[in-house]
């Protein structure tokens, strides 16, 4: 069977008092929904989704899609303006049958909490796992620990897994290459896409990993010609 998979950091516009997917450039929630529909996406990992953005997304998106994943701060922290503004989820959006979902906290101290959302899906008679994450952007030592933690998550279960997210690092990073090699040893491969996905970095910091046995039919990182994010999405069609 074929699957269309995507990852997209939709950018929390934190300079606004509250971000619901709308700013002076337009309605980015609607643009995100159009992107999902126009590309017939089966599974997409979204990073930096705020609660107000998610509320509007749930209203606009086709009801066949489900949005799963908890926020990085508990409800208690929502009483504070700072943590409420930065309370994001790494959601997984899919129209496939969801079996279960769990959100894990990655090593993060003393920086802002980082999470990984894990969802098990039923595809015809097969169960697969999807992991969506967003790693530390400033402190390399913390990001390296997060990479190690993700390897452990993958090793915990032999089920075929899609790993997607904003890793905040490129293939020029030695530790990230060690991570790639570790994943190769447990039969995963990085989608070989080296186009720019962030306006500052010339190489992609957003990545998709899939089982080695899956065939890659098509890869793209489209320029959406809108101000939805400072990232570009990655889309890949695979055959399982």
Label the model's feature ranges.
Residues 1-60, 79, 148, 240:
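N-terminal, active-site-proximal structural segment of metallo-dependent hydrolase catalytic domains
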Residues 2-18, 102, 118, 127-136:
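Active-site-proximal beta-strand elements of phosphoester/diester hydrolases
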Residues 3, 42-43, 128, 160-162, ...:
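Short, Asp-centered acidic motifs that coordinate Mg2+ and/or phosphate
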Residues 11, 49-50, 97-99, 134-136, ...:
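Catalytic metal-binding/acid-base residues of hydrolase active sites
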Residues 43, 47-127, 222-225:
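Structured beta-strand-rich core segments of catalytic domains in phosphoester-bond hydrolases
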Residues 66-95, 112-113, 168-233:
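Active site of divalent-metal-dependent phosphoester/diester hydrolases
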Residues 118-123, 127-131, 141-182:
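His/acidic metal-ligating clusters that form di-metal
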């Amino acid at each position: 069977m074929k699957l269309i998979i995507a990852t997209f950091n939709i950018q929390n516009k934190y300079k606004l008092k509250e971000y619901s997917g709308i700013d002076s450039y337009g309605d980015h929630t609607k643009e995100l929904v159009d992107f999902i529909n126009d590309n017939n996406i089966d599974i997409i990992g979204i990073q930096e989704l705020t609660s107000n953005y998610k509320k509007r997304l749930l209203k606009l998106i086709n009801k066949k899609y489900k949005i799963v994943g908890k926020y990085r701060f508990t409800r208690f922290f929502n009483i504070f303006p700072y943590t409420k503004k930065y309370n994001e989820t790494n959601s997984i959006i899919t129209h496939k049958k969801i079996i279960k979902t769990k959100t894990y906290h990655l090593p993060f101290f003393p920086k802002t909490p980082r999470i990984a959302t894990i969802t098990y899906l039923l595809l015809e008679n097969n169960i697969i796992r999807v992991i969506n994450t967003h790693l530390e952007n400033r402190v390399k030592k913390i990001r390296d620990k997060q990479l190690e933690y993700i390897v452990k998550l993958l090793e915990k279960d032999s089920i075929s897994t899609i790993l997607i997210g904003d890793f905040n690092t490129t293939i020029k990073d030695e530790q990230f290459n060690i991570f790639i090699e570790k994943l190769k040893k447990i039969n995963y491969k990085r989608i070989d896409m080296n186009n720019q996905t962030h306006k500052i970095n010339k190489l992609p910091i957003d990545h998709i990993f899939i089982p080695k046995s899956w065939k890659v039919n098509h890869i793209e990182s489209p320029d959406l010609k809108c101000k939805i994010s400072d990232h570009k999405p990655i889309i890949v069609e695979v055959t399982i």
